[in-house]
């Protein structure tokens, strides 16, 4: 159960960080 909770927290952290960066500075895919 610890592994599942750890994975869930890591995923949530990565998603939160991704959205924070995306909303702060929209990525330019067309370089």
Curated annotation (Swiss-Prot):
Membrane topology classification: Single-pass membrane protein
Transmembrane segments: 3-23
Cellular localization per UniProt: Cellular thylakoid membrane
An example Gene Ontology biological process: photosynthesis
Keywords for this protein: Membrane, Photosynthesis, Photosystem II, Thylakoid, Transmembrane, Transmembrane helix
Keyword Thylakoid recorded: yes
Coiled-coil stretches noted in the UniProt entry, renumbered to this chain: none
GO cellular component: photosystem II reaction center; plasma membrane-derived thylakoid membrane
Family indicated by similarity: Belongs to the PsbT family.
Assembly information from the UniProt record: PSII is composed of 1 copy each of membrane proteins PsbA, PsbB, PsbC, PsbD, PsbE, PsbF, PsbH, PsbI, PsbJ, PsbK, PsbL, PsbM, PsbT, PsbX, PsbY, Psb30/Ycf12, peripheral proteins PsbO, CyanoQ (PsbQ), PsbU, PsbV and a large number of cofactors. It forms dimeric complexes.
Job of this protein: Found at the monomer-monomer interface of the photosystem II (PS II) dimer, plays a role in assembly and dimerization of PSII. PSII is a light-driven water plastoquinone oxidoreductase, using light energy to abstract electrons from H(2)O, generating a proton gradient subsequently used for ATP formation.
Protein name: Photosystem II reaction center protein T
Native source species: Prochlorococcus marinus (strain SARG / CCMP1375 / SS120)
Lineage, opening ranks: Bacteria, Bacillati, Cyanobacteriota, Cyanophyceae, Synechococcales
